[in-house]
Amino acid sequence: MNPNLAKVLLIDRDQERRNERISVLKQHGYKVFPALDLQQARSRCKPGAFDLIVVNSGGQPDMALELCEWIKSNDSKQAVLLIAATGNQLPHRDYIVSDVPKQLLDRIESLFKGVEVAVKAA
């Protein structure tokens, strides 16, 4: 997928990290839409509105997992990437452990490559 066309919802309460992640993703052509809290995230999560939703657990893994499950229950095809402090006991396949921006970018690009392959194979 062309990053210039990809819309990413970034849910992150930590202003410094959020700004850093937004900057890196925008530099690589992604359209980034920040959500600062759970309420704002839920109001923006409409089926098909985003190509990817990135959720930072921000020290609240239970709340982040609940949000991921809520997103998937509303749109089972929605790609969701969870950023967590630790990967222990996470039921999700698509997560990274407390990232640095390069790791986040690499993971997002690999997710979109997987989407392209799936679309081409269909």
Task: Go through the PLM ranges and name each one.
Residues 36-52:
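Acidic, metal-coordinating helix/loop segments flanking the phosphotransfer/catalytic sites
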Residues 14-17, 39, 55-62:
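Short acidic, S/G/P-rich loop/turn micro-motifs used as interaction or catalytic elements
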Residues 77-90, 98:
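A short, hydrophobic beta-strand element within the central beta-sheet of small alpha/beta folds
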Residues 51, 93-94:
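Conserved acidic residues
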Residues 1-17, 87-89, 100-122:
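Non-catalytic signal-transmission and effector/linker regions of two-component phosphorelay proteins
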Residues 15-33:
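Two-component/phosphorelay signaling modules centered on CheY-like receiver
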Residues 54-73, 77:
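Conserved phosphotransfer microenvironments
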